[in-house]
């Protein structure tokens, strides 16, 4: 059985890819996919980044941000290059979601850029 939160990320994936294609992004080129990870605990986030690095994933520099309520949160992205294939990105999303869960940090979805 698929986790309810993961199912929401799958729905997000389907919607985002459909919107990108509708807007005319080039579906014949690779897109940079940025998977977002966050935690209020920097040590946990750092351990997640190290775990991802050991898996051979491209880790972007961690950043500190302030939430609307004033709380601080730390975040980093894992960047991949993928075609806009729903099944492929769902599989990647599931792997990222599970990595976040194993490391005790939040998976905050993914984003990409419009490609000409």
Swiss-Prot record:
The molecular function GO annotations come to: endoribonuclease inhibitor activity; enzyme binding
Name the Gene3D superfamilies on file: RraB-like
Please state where this protein is localized.
Answer: Cytoplasm
| Xref: Pfam families | RraB
Task: Work out whether the entry's keyword set contains Cytoplasm.
Answer: yes
Q: Which cysteines are joined by disulfide bonds?
A: none
User: What keywords are annotated for this sequence in UniProt?
Assistant: Cytoplasm
Q: According to its record, what are the GO cellular component terms? A: cytoplasm
Q: Subunit arrangement?
A: Interacts with the C-terminal region of Rne.
- Could you tell me which HAMAP family the record lists for this protein? RraB
Its function?
Answer: Globally modulates RNA abundance by binding to RNase E (Rne) and regulating its endonucleolytic activity. Can modulate Rne action in a substrate-dependent manner by altering the composition of the degradosome.
Matches recorded under NCBIfam families: PRK11191.1 (NF008393)
| Family statement drawn from the similarity comment of this UniProt entry | Belongs to the RraB family.
| Name by which UniProt lists this protein | Regulator of ribonuclease activity B
